[in-house]
């Protein structure tokens, strides 16, 4: 994730070369609903990682997919505050868990 953020952050004209932004899918997803994702990379996002993603803002990161039951509310607020669309995925969360966020 960090390598991708650094690469995209340092591009001068992303649209000219066909990069519209990143969709980060994971690593904050349910292990039981991981799909094709490698279980070794599934983990809770650290404060530092959330700060780094948010600092790139929606110029770089357009969407991040997370499992609500694994997400920390303050992380969601920070990402949404940076203009990043937080999407629900790879989850066993109930409707009530999702709407409470």
Walk through the language-model features, giving the residues of each.
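Histidine/acidic-residue-rich, glycine-tolerant segments that coordinate divalent metal ions
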Residues: 1-101
């Amino acid at each position: 994730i960090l390598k991708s953020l650094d690469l995209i952050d340092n591009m001068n004209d992303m649209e000219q070369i066909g990069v519209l932004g990143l969709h980060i899918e994971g690593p904050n997803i349910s292990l039981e609903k991981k799909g094709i994702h490698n279980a070794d990379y599934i983990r809770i996002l650290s404060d530092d990682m959330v700060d780094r993603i948010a600092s790139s803002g929606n110029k770089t990161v357009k969407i991040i997919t997370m499992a609500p039951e694994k997400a920390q509310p303050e992380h969601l607020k920070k990402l949404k505050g940076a203009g990043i669309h937080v999407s629900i995925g790879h989850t066993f969360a109930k409707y009530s868990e999702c709407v409470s966020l």
